[in-house]
Regions:
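Extended active-site neighborhood of metal-dependent phosphoesterases/phosphodiesterases
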Residues: 103, 117-218, 233-234, 238-248, ...
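N-terminal active-site segment of His-dependent metallophosphoesterases
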Residues: 68-128, 202, 209, 229-230
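N-terminal low-complexity, Pro/Thr/Ser-rich intrinsically disordered segments
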Residues: 47-80
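Residue-level marker for buried hydrophobic side chains located in beta-strands
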Residues: 81-83, 109-111, 143-144, 221, ...
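Short, solvent-exposed aromatic-acidic interface loops
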Residues: 325-334
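N-terminal export and membrane-targeting signals
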Residues: 1-10
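C-terminal region of N-terminal signal peptides and the immediate post-cleavage residues
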Residues: 15-47, 53, 64, 89
């Protein structure tokens, strides 16, 4: 398949087509500082020289070339999360490039699964993940279990390597508060090791109880397989019970990997309908180092997509919202903006 080297972003001013080069599209005027947006929305803010476009939820298939700018620490001292999924293999170097980004950026590190290819073995964690992202184990607090991570002894090497960043109380789903946010790690390997994702499964029962007990205004959940995706794996209906539980309590943000690309969706309900009032924003960040893959389709409500750049997502967890910025390793692509919690 030929990889597309163009950008198509439907912005507030109309459809913009860019073939190569940089693009700047003036979006709606921010209402509350750079990158601010209306409550519940999630719109990338354009700024002079940034190459970052403001896009509407109706954006069509495309890639947005841009000039990445390294994020700066939050001046307010709000917690920062940094991460991606689909990270390390010994015959590649792109994971070392994304690790170099982590080295220059302060914050808590998370992974979105498929951390050490091909099989999550002890040797692969030591020899492939270790020299790159493994240098930041002391900063790594949230580790998602991907399907490749279960290939060896049902994930035992990963549990031993990451400890309670990956497994707590004997399971691969857990939560904790970070600043004003409730952060949840889930296991989306629904068909492996028995049913894990059904509405009456122990994991989803735990999730509903955990959400009911939380007093945080803002909620973020992360797991490996995306419910919605334009990528090679497409939509995963098996994780729909996660979305049902999260949407019912007004959760705000979901992070996934699995597809080897970057994609951001407008807020949606569990059925994939646009919902600017109560919808959840999903980001797929499978750009940690494994070879990138072309998109298979144009999923509804997908507003930014790139399969051309490895990188990490930086999230600034503010008391009533979040700032986000995708930082690529080669400076070829960036996506940034702000969302407001429900």
């Amino acid at each position: 398949m030929v990889r597309l080297g163009l950008a198509v972003i439907l912005a507030a001013v109309g459809t913009v087509l860019v073939v190569g080069g940089l693009m700047n599209v003036a979006g709606p005027a921010p209402s509350d500082g750079p990158g601010a947006s209306a409550p519940g929305s999630d719109v990338a803010a354009a700024s002079p020289g940034s190459g970052v476009a403001a896009a509407s939820p109706a954006a069509t298939r495309g890639v947005e070339p841009a000039t990445a700018r390294a994020p700066t620490p939050s001046p307010s001292g709000d917690p920062v999360l940094l991460g991606a999924g689909d990270i390390a293999r010994c015959d590649g170097t792109d994971d070392e490039a994304t690790a170099a980004l982590l080295e220059g950026l302060p914050g808590i590190v998370f992974t979105l699964g498929d951390n050490a290819y091909e099989d999550g073995s002890t040797a692969e964690l030591r020899d492939c993940y270790g020299p790159s992202w493994g240098r930041f184990l002391d900063r790594t607090r949230f580790v998602v279990t991907g399907n490749h991570d279960l290939h060896t002894d049902d994930g035992a090497p990963e549990a031993a390597y990451f400890g309670d960043a990956a497994v707590r109380d004997g399971v691969t789903w857990f939560s904790e508060d970070v600043g004003a946010w409730h952060v949840i790690v889930l296991d989306g390997n629904c068909g492996l090791l028995g049913g894990r994702c059904g509405a009456d499964s122990p994991q989803v029962r735990w999730l509903r109880d955990d959400l009911a007990a939380s007093t945080a205004r803002c909620t973020l959940a992360m797991w490996h397989q995306p419910r919605f995706s334009s990528g090679q794996h497409g939509n995963d209906r098996a994780v729909a019970p996660f979305w049902d539980a999260l949407y019912a309590v007004g959760a705000d943000l979901v992070l996934n990997g699995h597809d080897h690309d970057y994609e951001r969706f407008a807020p949606q309900d569990p059925d994939g309908n646009a919902d600017g009032a109560r919808g959840i924003t999903e980001m797929v960040v499978g750009t940690g180092g494994i070879g990138l893959e072309d998109f298979e389709t144009s999923a509804a409500n997908s507003i930014v997509r790139s399969s051309l750049a490895h990188g990490v997502i930086e999230l600034t967890l503010q008391p009533s919202g979040w700032g986000f910025r995708f930082v690529s390793t080669d400076g070829s692509f960036s996506d940034q903006g702000h969302g407001t919690c429900h």
